[in-house]
Every structure is written in C-alpha cells, then in structure tokens.
C-alpha cells in the first residue's frame, strides 16, 4: 500500500459548526470515490456511536482513506481526518488539524458563519492549512450563497471568489470539491529520509486488541516489524499490526511520511497513547517530539452517584472502561451522607459531561444521579497557602480562609443584531464584564465578555439559545483566576448539612438562591412525625429558613368528656415523644428532592 508517492497524497479535514452538514458531506465523498459501496452506506457513516448519530454531533474522530482518479487522469490518495465541532473538544481539533495540509470550511448557506467554525478556522490558519470555503445546503429555500460569501470574506478574511457551492444531500458540487482538494491542498513534505516521527491524532479502545491508535506519519517511515516509543508517556511497544482506514481497517507492512494509518500494539489504556503524543522508533528515536502536546485538564466537575447503592461496583467498572477510551475523563471516589457512595468526576466541559453520563446510562445500563456541575476554585488560606478545590462542600470555613478565586473565561458570542439587548442582559445577570462589541456585518454582531466559568457551566448555553431563537453561537477560553466576593452556601436539613446541595455563590446572589432552595425542599420532603427545620446558611449565619410541620396522631380521640387533666397528660406525653424523636430521628431526603433542587436554576 505504500508504493504511492508523497506528491499524490492529500490530507484534509472538514471544519464546520454543529448541524452545518459535515457528516453528510463526508458520506458523499466516501460514496463518490467508491470507498464505501452503495449497499453498505448508512447516514453519518463516520459517526460510529449511536449517541453521535442521535445528537447529530461528532465526538470521536474518525479517519478514512479514499482513492480518487482526478481529471488529469492521475490517481490520488485523499485522507479525510474528521474533527469534532464542539467547543469542549477543541484540543482534539487542534491535533487533527496538525495532521492535515488543507481544510474544507463548510458553512451552511442559510445560516452563515457561527462561533465554533470561527474558532476552528483560526486554529487552521495558525497551522498554515490551505482553506477551501464550501457553501453547503444551497438547495434550501432560505439559502443565500452570495451573502454568506461576503460574510466569510468580512469575518474571516478568506477569498471566496472560488468558493464551491454544494448540497451534500443531493450530491451537487461534490466532484468540484474532490477536484479542489487535489488542486489546492498541498501534498505533504517529502521527509522519508528523516528520523521517524508520527503524530497521534486519535485513539480508541478495542476490547480484543487493546488501544488502536490513529496517527499521521510526519517524517520517516513505520514498519510493522519495529518497536515503537511514545515520547510523552515514555513507554515502548512491539507493533502487532499497522494499516490504513479505508474506512474499514486493512493491514499493510509499512507507512511512510505523509500517510495516515492506524496501529495496534497491545497498549492497555488510552491514557498511555494520548492524543498529540509523538511515536518514534525505539532503536533510532527522534531528538525531540512534535510540538503542541498538552495533557487534557478537566474544567467542570460533578458527583455521579448510582440511584441504587448496589450499583456502585458496576459504576466503578464502567468508569474504568470508559476511561480506557476517553483519556480526558478523571474520577475519584466520594461519599456523601445523603447519596451514599459515588464518584467525583472531571470533564472538559458541559457537553462532555452529558455525553459521559449518557454513555454510562446507555452502554452500561446504570441509573445515575448527577450533582450540580462546579468548577475548580482557588482558595487562599490564612497562612499564605493556596489550595485548589473542585468540590464546594470541602471548602474551609470562613475563619480559615482569606479569599476565594474563581476561573474566568473570555467569551465571544456571535448573533444577529436584534438579539443584542437580551444577550447583554443575560451576560450581566451572569456577572459578565463587558469588553467589546463589534459589528461583523450590518446585521451580525460579536459581543466579547469576561465571565466566571461557574456561570457558564450551568445553563448559559440553553438560555442563550432560547433567548435568541437558536441563532446565537458562542465560544470561550480560560483566561485565569480572579478574586471575587464568594461564599459557601450550605443547606441544613434538621440541623445536618446536606453535602450535595452545597454550592459556591456570589454574596449578592446568596440570599435569593438560599431562599428558593429552602422553599423547594419544603415542597418536596415528605412530612415526618416531628417538625423539620430546613435552613440555608453561610458559615454560622442562617440566611433563609422554612420548616415542615409534624404529622400528628389525634391522641384525644378516645377521651369522651371527662377531666381536662387527663387530656393534658396525653398531650404532654405526645410532646415528649416528639421531642425525643426529633433528637434521634433522621430525615430521609428522597432522591427526587435532590434532583429537583439540582435542576432548580443550578
């Protein structure tokens, strides 16, 4: 398979916002080059998880090799490296872009450029990729190709005079795209003589062969009889097989510079073969690895608890298995008096969190309770020490700390002009600091805010979409920690702290949140035989309180007339019993109550 010359190889990826038709376009390219037979074709061929097909998003990267006979009657090999389009997975995107020389920029001709597309285009420009603008869905009645071309020129500064109009659904313009890839995307550099370096741009776990690594050979060549060394994890392996994805795996003996392939080497866990790591030969290693490798750091944390305590071992096993294929997932065991045993998990972002939760419930058949998402806070203690805390209930008491710092993000929101006011209102509610506002075109605007990450991870995205009828899009990146007037808000039920409901809030918002929490709990906790106080507190100060009145048995029902002292005696005895019960009784908080409160405006 390696007899192809480097000048005939084209490596490209597709950049697009969610829903702009990237997966459908990939399907058409596979079909038109004859890579996938008509009868094997299914919608979104490269999105292998059910979850991806259902949500219509790409989570795991896939790669496919196509052969294409161009108009100059030469045969070319086109390697499509698929990229996820969501902000949580931007590190994966940057790695796939590093493995390419060109990119198709797919924009929906009826919707225009969106935030996520822009973020990825800038990444592509940083990697010096040749960008080919493609306007998709031109068959839709609302499509306005000329207006969108102008938008691309104004926002991104790309020349769109030779942009391609296409409709992936009907197959219009697919041939033009293939020709443009051959003509405009530069071939890889011919570096076969240099020491071997290959970039890992994806890996997944196969229960039979261990981790399967997708890589692009940057320089030198890789033979299946050699031992490899992974430069970041410092581990070495003997190769079991190497091959190409066409799009099913086919074994080959050797791959050289410029080619894209997969390898299996009995690697135990995805964490050993991280995205962005460099593969080199054990006997003649390269001097330095490829630049840009980062370990994935979780930004959002939450507790995962099984609804049934017996499922705890199953949850542990499932998380271990999931971590084999998802190196960005971090977890550690945690216990809570209200929820029992569970895990504290770290994720790249909200979408990542939802996907992990859904995969656990779907693929491993678990019922889970998820506590409210939180971020990592930096707590400055009195002795000039700093600690980082991801679980609000473990933050030290006010007398032991000087201040709490929280992570801030710089957020860019792209939206039509008419939603300007409502978006600015939303950002102000979420303690955003206004930085700048730019008009991209006459009717589209960019708002730039600096906002605490904690305000973004709850339901900012949903709110933004609902306030703008789905037209706004956003992207953000971390800019560091800042001091704020933050407090730990505890909820006490019958004078006991309920850990899962502890949160860190801004002092100005604490009363409103505390008030609504106790009112909601009052509705949801069933009455007991004794009175239950529910309180919201900051340190030792109670800021809001409600109580659930006791159920009472009518102890006087058997007294007909008679002396009043008899009745008093019975009532006194009942009151004494209630007092003892209150001192000893435990309040069982139903899980529905926790769920409802966690959903309550998190």
From Swiss-Prot:
Membrane topology per record: Peripheral membrane protein
Instruction: Tell me which Pfam families the record gives.
Output: EFG_C (PF00679), GTP_EFTU (PF00009), GTP_EFTU_D2 (PF03144), LepA_C (PF06421)
What is the uppermost EC class here?
hydrolase
Q: What is this protein called?
A: Elongation factor 4
**Which subcellular locations apply to this protein?**
Cell inner membrane
Q: What is its main location?
A: membrane
The answer on whether this UniProt entry bears the keyword Protein biosynthesis reads yes
What this protein catalyses is: GTP + H2O = GDP + phosphate + H(+)
Keywords on record: Cell inner membrane, Cell membrane, GTP-binding, Hydrolase, Membrane, Nucleotide-binding, Protein biosynthesis
Where do the annotations place GTP binding? 19-24, 136-139
Enzyme Commission number, as recorded: 3.6.5.n1
Summarizing the function annotation, the protein's role is: Required for accurate and efficient protein synthesis under certain stress conditions. May act as a fidelity factor of the translation reaction, by catalyzing a one-codon backward translocation of tRNAs on improperly translocated ribosomes. Back-translocation proceeds from a post-translocation (POST) complex to a pre-translocation (PRE) complex, thus giving elongation factor G a second chance to translocate the tRNAs correctly. Binds to ribosomes in a GTP-dependent manner.
| GO terms for cellular component | plasma membrane
Query: GO MF annotations for this entry?
Result: GTP binding; GTPase activity; ribosome binding
**Domain annotation tr-type G: ranges:** 7-189
Q: Which GO biological process categories is it annotated with?
A: positive regulation of translation; translation
**What is stated as this protein's family in its record?**
Belongs to the TRAFAC class translation factor GTPase superfamily. Classic translation factor GTPase family. LepA subfamily.
